[in-house]
Amino acid sequence: MTGLFSYPKRHLKKLVKDGDYVEALEFGKSLEAKFSNDPDYLFIMGGIYFILEDAKKAMPYFEKSLDIKNDDVETLMLKTNAHLLLQQKNEAIVCCKKILNLEPKNYEAFGLLEKLESV
């Protein structure tokens, strides 16, 4: 068990993979000072909040992750979905367009953008 705690992000990912989201959230919060500028950590924490249906708390993690690594399509897609949960259609459209600038053949973003622009 010592090995997992030598690699705290690995332990955090394992908790998420095992579906222990509440425990992962608590453990992740304890790592925040050490990993506050790590885009992978920020993505994981935002993802946990998103899974726990707290898009409002997920958003700052996604935003900071994208400030550090602005070409991360996975983070942009989760941020898009968080905007949708928060009923922020225009922000979701902006995210879809950013995804398509990075990956013009991203069918998920393309389909979602078409749907959002037609409503």
What are the functions of these language-model segments?
Residues 17-18, 51-52, 85, 115-119:
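Register position in tetratricopeptide repeats
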Residues 4-5, 39-40, 73-74, 107-108:
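Helix-start (N-cap) detector for alpha-helical repeat units in TPR-like alpha-solenoids
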Residues 29-33, 63-67, 100-101:
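Conserved structural position within tetratricopeptide repeats
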